[in-house]
C-alpha cells in the first residue's frame, strides 16, 4: 500500500507505490517505455528522450531539458523528480524539485509538491495541494481561485506569497487565523484557506508574509494609458525616445553588450524603422533585424528597437511606480522598466522589472548603488507561474525600504541605499542580447513588448511601510 498525506480538506493524497521495475535512458532511443507495474525511469542528461509509463505508479528522474515524461490520464500516481525548475504537466500527481533557487509548480490536480535542501519557490497551482519545502528558505506562493493548500513544514525562514486575497498587513493575517488541533488555518477568500501543519499563531512573524499593495495610501502623480504616444518635442510631450545624453539618431548601451540600436523615430534617416506603434490603447515596442539601408546610421548594429524615458517631463522622489505590460517570450529579448536619477548621474538605478524572453517564469528586481564607494547591486529573481499576457510590474520606493510587486503581490524587498533619496525618472525599453543572450533565430519574427499603461503615485505623508 502506498504512503499518503492528508491535504487541507482532509483528503488523502498518495505518494505512489514502491517501484518494481527500473529503466535507464542511457543508450536508449528517443522513446523509453515502462511496464504496467510501478516503474522508476531514469533519464540521461545527454539523451533526447521521452519516457512513457503505463498504468502503475511511476517516478521519472529528469536531468536536462531534452528529458521528458509522458503519462495517460488516470494511469496511476505518477511523480517527477528533477533538479531543474519545473512545471508539472497534466496527468502527473507529484513533483520534487531539488535545485537551489529553482521553482516547482503544480497542475490543475491536487498535487504533492516538494523542494530540496536549498531554497525553492513552490506553487501548487489549482487543486488542493500539499506543499513541503524540505529545508532552506522557501517561498510558498498562492493565488486566489486555486483551492485550499497545506504547508507541511513551514519554517521561520520560509515566506508565504499571497496574490489576490487582499491582505495588506500582518495584523490582517492574524485576524484571519484559527487553531484547529495542531494545525493553524488561515481563511483566505471564497471559502479557500491555507493550513500550516503543526504550527501555532505565536510562531508566525510579519516577515514571513509577502502581502498585497495597499493602494489606499497612494495618490496618482503620473499616468499614460497610451491612447497616443506623446513624444517630447522639447517644449511639450511626455516621452523622450532616446537617452538624454544620446545624439539625435539614438544610441545603445555598449557596456551591457546589447545587440540593438534604440531608434529615435523623429530622426529622418532611421524613421522607416520606427519601433513604436499604438493600437487600442496599447503601446507596442518592436525589436527586429536592422535593414541594410539604415545600418550606417545605427553604427552597424544587427537589430533595432525602442526606448522611452520621462527625463524631460517627470521625476519623483519615493512613491509607487507601475507598468502593466505583456512581455516578449523570444530568446534574447530583454524588456525592462526602470528608474534613473533626474540629475543624470549613475548609479543609483532602480530596476522595477527586467526579464529574459526565454525565461518567462522569472521576474528580476534589482537596485544598484554607489553607497559603498563602488557600484554594487542587490538583485532578486522572483519565480512566478505565468507572465503570458498582461501583468502589473511595480516598485514601492520609500525612504527606508524598496518593495517590488507582481500583480499587486510583493515578490522582493531591499533596504533603500543611502544614495537613493533624490528624484528619479522612468524608462521603458526592449533590449536584445546582453543579459538575455543572443537570439537563436536571428529574431526573424521580431519581438514585441506591449505596454498598457505606466503610472506613478506619491505616498501619504503619514504612511510608513
Curated annotation (Swiss-Prot):
Main location: secreted
Domain GH16 residue range list: 213-462
Coiled coil spans: none
Tree of life domain: Bacteria
The keyword Hydrolase is annotated on this UniProt entry: yes
GO molecular function: calcium ion binding; hydrolase activity, hydrolyzing O-glycosyl compounds
Stretches forming Hemolysin-type calcium-binding repeats: 33-50, 105-122, 123-140
Active site: 349 (nucleophile), 354 (proton donor)
Keywords from the named record: Exopolysaccharide synthesis, Glycosidase, Hydrolase, Plasmid, Repeat, Secreted
PROSITE patterns named in the record: GH16_2
Pfam families, A to Z: Glyco_hydro_16 (PF00722), HemolysinCabind (PF00353)
Cited InterPro entries: ConA-like_dom_sf, GH16, Glycosyl_Hydrlase_16, Hemolysn_Ca-bd, Serralysin-like_metalloprot_C
Pathway the protein contributes to: Glycan metabolism; exopolysaccharide biosynthesis
SUPFAM superfamilies reported for this sequence: beta-Roll (SSF51120), Concanavalin A-like lectins/glucanases (SSF49899)
Subcellular localization, as worded in the UniProt entry: Secreted
Enzyme Commission designation: 3.2.1.-
A single cellular component GO annotation: extracellular region
Uppermost EC category: hydrolase
Gene Ontology process terms (BP): polysaccharide biosynthetic process
Role summary: Cleaves high molecular weight succinoglycan to yield LMW succinoglycan. Dynamically regulates the molecular weight distribution of succinoglycan by cleaving nascent succinoglycan only during a limited period after its synthesis, perhaps before it undergoes a time-dependent change in its conformation or aggregation state.
PANTHER family reported in the protein's UniProt record: GLYCOSIDE HYDROLASE FAMILY 16 PROTEIN, GLYCOSYL HYDROLASE-RELATED
Family: Belongs to the glycosyl hydrolase 16 family.
Full protein name: Endo-1,3-1,4-beta-glycanase EglC
Organism: Rhizobium meliloti (strain 1021)
Amino acid at each position: 500500500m502506498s504512503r499518503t498525506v492528508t491535504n487541507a480538506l482532509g483528503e488523502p493524497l498518495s505518494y505512489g507505490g514502491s517501484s518494481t521495475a527500473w529503466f535507464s535512458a542511457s543508450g536508449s532511443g528517443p522513446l523509453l517505455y515502462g511496464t504496467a507495474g510501478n516503474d522508476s525511469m531514469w533519464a540521461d542528461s545527454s539523451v533526447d528522450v521521452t519516457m512513457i509509463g503505463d498504468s502503475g505508479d511511476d517516478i521519472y528522474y529528469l536531468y536536462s531539458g531534452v528529458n521528458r515524461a509522458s503519462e495517460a490520464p488516470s494511469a496511476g500516481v505518477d511523480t517527477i523528480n528533477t533538479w531543474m525548475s519545473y512545471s508539472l504537466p497534466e496527468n502527473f500527481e507529484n513533483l520534487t524539485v531539488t535545485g537551489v533557487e529553482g521553482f516547482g509548480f503544480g497542475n490543475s490536480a491536487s498535487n504533492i509538491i516538494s523542494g530540496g535542501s536549498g531554497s525553492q519557490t513552490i506553487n501548487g497551482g489549482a487543486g488542493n495541494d500539499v506543499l513541503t519545502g524540505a529545508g532552506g528558505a522557501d517561498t510558498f506562493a498562492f493565488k486566489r481561485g486555486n483551492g485550499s493548500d497545506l504547508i507541511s513544514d513551514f519554517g521561520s525562514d520560509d515566506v508565504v506569497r499571497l496574490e489576490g486575497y487582499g491582505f495588506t498587513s500582518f495584523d490582517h493575517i492574524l485576524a484571519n487565523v484559527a487553531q484547529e488541533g495542531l494545525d493553524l488555518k488561515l481563511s483566505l477568500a471564497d471559502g479557500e484557506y491555507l493550513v500550516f501543519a503543526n504550527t501555532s499563531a505565536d510562531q508566525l512573524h510579519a516577515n514571513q508574509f509577502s502581502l498585497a499593495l495597499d493602494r489606499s495610501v497612494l495618490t496618482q502623480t503620473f499616468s499614460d494609458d497610451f491612447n497616443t504616444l506623446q513624444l517630447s518635442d522639447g517644449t511639450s510631450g511626455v516621452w523622450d525616445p532616446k537617452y538624454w545624453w544620446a545624439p539625435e539618431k539614438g544610441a545603445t548601451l555598449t557596456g551591457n553588450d546589447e545587440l540593438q540600436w534604440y531608434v529615435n523615430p523623429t530622426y529622418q534617416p532611421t524613421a522607416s524603422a520606427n519601433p513604436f506603434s499604438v493600437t487600442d490603447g496599447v503601446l507596442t515596442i518592436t525589436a527586429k533585424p536592422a535593414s541594410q539601408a539604415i545600418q550606417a546610421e545605427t553604427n552597424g548594429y544587427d537589430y533595432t528597437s525602442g526606448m522611452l524615458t520621462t527625463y524631460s517631463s517627470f521625476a519623483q522622489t519615493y512613491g509607487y511606480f507601475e507598468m502593466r505590460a505583456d512581455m516578449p517570450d523570444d530568446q534574447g529579448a530583454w524588456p525592462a522598466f526602470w528608474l534613473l536619477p533626474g540629475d543624470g548621474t549613475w548609479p543609483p538605478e532602480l530596476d522595477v522589472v527586467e526579464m529574459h524572453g526565454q525565461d518567462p517564469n522569472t521576474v528580476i528586481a534589482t537596485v544598484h548603488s554607489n553607497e559603498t564607494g563602488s557600484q554594487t547591486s542587490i538583485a532578486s529573481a522572483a519565480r512566478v507561474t505565468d507572465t503570458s499576457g498582461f501583468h502589473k510590474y511595480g516598485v514601492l520606493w520609500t525612504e527606508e525600504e524598496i518593495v517590488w510587486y507582481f500583480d499587486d503581490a510583493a515578490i522582493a524587498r531591499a533596504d533603500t541605499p543611502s544614495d537613493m533619496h533624490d528624484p528619479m525618472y522612468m524608462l521603458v525599453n526592449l533590449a536584445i542580447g546582453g543579459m538575455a543572450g543572443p537570439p537563436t533565430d536571428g529574431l526573424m519574427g521580431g519581438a514585441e513588448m506591449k505596454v498598457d499603461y505606466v503610472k506613478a503615485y506619491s505616498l501619504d505623508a503619514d504612511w510608513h511601510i
